Amino acid sequence: VDAAVLEKLQAGFKKLEAATDCKSLLKKYLSKDIFDKLKGQKTSLGATLLDVIQSGVENLDSGVGIYAPDAEAYTLFAPLFDPIIEDYHVGFKQTDKHPNKDFGDVSSFVNVDPEGQYVISTRVRCGRSMEGYPFNPCLTEAQYKEMQQKVSSTLSSLEGELKGTYFPLTGMSKEVQQKLIDDHFLFKEGDRFLQAANACRYWPAGRGIYHNDNKTFLVWVNEEDHLRIISMQMGGDLGQVFRRLTSAVNEIEKRIPFSHHDRLGFLTFCPTNLGTTVRASVHIKLPKLAANRDKLEEVAGKYNLQVRGTRGEHTEAEGGIYDISNKRRMGLTEFQAVKEMQDGILQLIKMEKEM
């Protein structure tokens, strides 16, 4: 590892040590011992500990503070990743092994709000990384373009309900751009956390969006992850949304090999998304429960649900609408993760009705 990188690492470590009010998992677990053990290591693609921690060093208000520059980083820098993964994915110990992919009996998922009183929309997404390519910080412009080529040709072969159009961000017309913004489909260049992790290089090369004609199926290409596969619709029919997602993932998987790790499951850029990578969420109005956000958080916590503001992480609830999703992604199957979310949402609705 060259001297300039080591110097930056030392300075970064000092900055973390001095930041007494920093609550990130990076600060909690990057001890002097682990730092000294890892600072000289380099993956075969040339990624160092600096690539792993720089976002968390620059943004001391990070919740987690680390990213994986490539798949090998999860193994090479395991002394730092493993305890952070165990802490975030509560209950997934360093000796545990994530189960094999299992979507389970998809017919057992239901409409959680058949009367349409509470749930505004339902969304299930998963992330995938393409085998043989590193994650954002290590990708070249040529690789971005090559990946886009592979993905867009795979997506354009989808049929039936999944049939749609691929829109590259490069050279996108103002009209198309505005249309995608109005539909809330367009992703922007990364926030300061991703910027600091070097996840936005060569923007917008190789980035794009695919959506089906009904606008219920969406793929983000080379945003935070190589692929974000998303199924969504208005209302509370979780069953329909999940079935659409699983059929899409199965189709894409036939053509594109995904990065998978024996212990950690499907690999993603951010360790919070590992394992199933599945986030099942609803936009939901619970005026009585939500009158007291702490109470809502407490109940949600019992069902391993995460409560966010309307527009996702780091936002407020607009008009009392919350984004509520499964928190656990590791150490359980895709089926179990979505089932846990379904059970929790049904319970929240039941409590709201009884108040």
Curated annotation (Swiss-Prot):
Catalytic activity reported: L-arginine + ATP = N(omega)-phospho-L-arginine + ADP + H(+)
Organism the protein comes from: Penaeus japonicus (Kuruma prawn)
Domain Phosphagen kinase N-terminal, chain residue ranges per copy: 8-90
InterPro entries cross-referenced by the UniProt entry: ATP-guanido_PTrfase, ATP-guanido_PTrfase_AS, ATP-guanido_PTrfase_cat, ATP-guanido_PTrfase_N, ATP-guanido_PTrfase_N_sf, Gln_synth/guanido_kin_cat_dom
Gene3D superfamilies given in the database record: ATP:guanido phosphotransferase, N-terminal domain, Glutamine synthetase/guanido kinase, catalytic domain
UniProt family annotation: Belongs to the ATP:guanido phosphotransferase family.
Any GO CC annotation of this UniProt entry: extracellular space
Domain of life the protein comes from: Eukaryota
Signal peptide: none
Domain Phosphagen kinase C-terminal: 118-355
EC number(s) from the headed UniProt entry: 2.7.3.3
GO annotation, biological process: phosphocreatine biosynthetic process
Chain positions recorded as L-arginine binding sites: G63, V64, G65, I66, Y67, E224, C270, E313
Assembly behavior: Monomer.
Example GO molecular function: creatine kinase activity
PROSITE patterns (UniProt xref): PHOSPHAGEN_KINASE, PHOSPHAGEN_KINASE_C, PHOSPHAGEN_KINASE_N
Annotated ATP binding sites: 121-125, 184, 228, 279-283, 308-313
Pfam families: ATP-gua_Ptrans (PF00217), ATP-gua_PtransN (PF02807)
CDD domains attached to this UniProt entry: arginine_kinase_like
Entry protein name: Arginine kinase
Keywords of the record: ATP-binding, Kinase, Nucleotide-binding, Transferase
Broadest EC class assigned to this enzyme: transferase
